[in-house]
């Protein structure tokens, strides 16, 4: 069957038009502060609006019945790619980032909530551009498709296809019958949490602008800051505890948080993946705090705990905020950081990585394999939350993990061939595919990605999008069979 190009253009046009309003919001902030960036944001919004009207006009009479999974996957992949292209215009046209490669990398990092940056002096940017930079995080956190499905009824029956293609986690199937309804509710929770974090940060030493920007980055588990020293700029225990806590909230399954808003707290506490996630956080924090104290890196017990809590929360939630140069903590924490980058948060959250849910299924399946060594005739299914996980799901998890690991190893080879150092290559690949944002070596806590080659930046941009869309959506499009009739 031929691809329904008109439908694809119609959907892209609708999303471009909606995205225009977000860019106009950044322009409004720019007009408020009057730092010279207002017109470039208006111009960029105009270009985006024109592209949206053209695409929507061409696809206006699209046949919505002739739509399948191929259209869904292509729309989602094109959305993230083209949003990054149009989203980079304020950076590039305004001269704040002087080449296309860096501008695209920065914007893709924003929309995918990776948080990697090529900027050496973030504080030199005007406030409208800084707000747009944080806003890319906030949109990408819950998923741009999910947001558009929530607000625009034109998607109709195509909503489920798009939702499946973008939110391809292992736990979202329960909501398929009411995709539009659920998308609206999830975004309601998302907005409330963002406002709550902004309010709490404003109660501390942050001004309103910084509080709003960091609230968007925190709930989206993104990591973009308005300061060169990231959250460490304020040197405030209160700020660090608030952000660390809500980074973990952002890494929790958002649907379970929604149930909490309905008063169904038991669903959160009884969920195995959530318990595994917070158990991992607890063990990692206590281990790191003990390590920092015993090694003499930090002799104050409370500060050792706070540093460990913040940095572990930042990495496992795939946020990438920093309050300390963890590279100076030694190889032990580097290895722990890589493990946390690999695992990351829960399915259905704003975080990246392999997800705790998959790790849990892999661990239970491995345990069953050992059991069958002594009881070969036993039928021992994998169970999650008391329910049997089908063999199909287990096989998908195994396949996903294999592809994820293969892509990690292959990508490390690619970057080292391009001249990156060993530590930098490993750190950059883990940070990009897991959407974590911070790596090792010169691209660690106090470094950035500016020294990498243009090829490496384009390749890492591809990894960011691939990781954000959970690999299969993007890689399937690269298969020749995808394009066959």
Regions found by a protein language model. Name each.
Residues 1-485:
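Membrane-proximal intracellular helices of multi-pass ion channels
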């Amino acid at each position: 069957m031929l691809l329904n190009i008109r439908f694809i253009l119609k959907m892209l046009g609708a999303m471009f038009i909606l995205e225009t309003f977000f860019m106009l919001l950044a322009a409004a902030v720019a007009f408020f502060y009057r730092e010279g960036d207002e017109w470039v944001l208006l111009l960029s919004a105009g270009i985006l609006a024109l592209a949206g009207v053209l695409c929507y006009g061409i696809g206006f009479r699209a046949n919505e019945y002739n739509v399948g999974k191929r259209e869904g996957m292509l729309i989602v992949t094109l959305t993230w790619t083209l949003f990054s292209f149009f989203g980079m215009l304020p950076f590039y046209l305004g001269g704040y980032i002087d080449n296309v490669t860096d501008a695209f990398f920065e914007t893709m990092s924003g929309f995918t909530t990776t948080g990697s940056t090529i900027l050496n002096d973030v504080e030199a940017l005007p406030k409208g551009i800084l707000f747009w930079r944080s806003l890319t995080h906030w949109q990408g956190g819950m998923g741009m498709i999910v947001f558009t499905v929530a607000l625009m009824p034109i998607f109709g029956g195509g909503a489920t296809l798009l939702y499946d293609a973008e939110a391809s986690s292992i736990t979202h199937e329960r909501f398929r019958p009411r995709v539009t309804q659920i998308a609206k509710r999830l975004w309601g929770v998302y907005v409330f949490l963002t406002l709550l974090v902004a309010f709490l940060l404003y109660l501390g030493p942050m001004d309103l602008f910084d509080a709003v920007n960091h609230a968007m980055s925190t709930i989206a588990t993104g990591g973009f800051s308005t300061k060169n020293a990231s959250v460490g700029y304020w040197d405030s225990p209160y700020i660090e505890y608030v952000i660390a806590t809500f980074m973990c909230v952002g890494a929790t399954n958002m649907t379970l948080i929604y149930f909490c808003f309905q008063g169904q707290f038991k669903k959160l506490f009884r969920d195995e993946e959530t318990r595994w996630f917070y158990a991992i956080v607890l063990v990692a924090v206590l281990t790191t705090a003990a390590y920092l104290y015993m090694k003499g890196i930090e002799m104050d017990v409370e500060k050792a705990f706070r540093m460990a809590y913040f940095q572990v929360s930042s990495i496992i939630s795939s946020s990438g905020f920093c309050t300390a140069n963890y590279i100076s903590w030694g190889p032990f924490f580097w290895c722990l950081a890589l493990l946390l980058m690999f695992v990351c948060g829960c399915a259905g959250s704003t975080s990246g990585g392999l997800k705790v849910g998959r790790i849990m299924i892999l661990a239970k399946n491995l345990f069953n394999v050992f059991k069958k060594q002594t009881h070969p005739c036993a039928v021992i299914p994998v169970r999650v939350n008391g329910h049997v996980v089908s063999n199909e799901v287990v096989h998908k998890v195994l396949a996903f993990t294999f592809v994820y690991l293969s892509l990690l190893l292959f990508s490390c080879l690619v970057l080292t061939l391009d001249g990156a150092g060993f530590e930098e290559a490993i750190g950059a690949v883990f940070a990009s595919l897991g959407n974590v944002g911070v790596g090792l070596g010169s691209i660690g806590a106090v470094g950035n990605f500016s020294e990498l080659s243009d090829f490496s930046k384009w390749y890492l941009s591809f990894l960011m999008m691939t990781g954000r869309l959970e690999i299969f959506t993007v890689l399937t499009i690269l298969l020749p069979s995808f394009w066959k009739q």
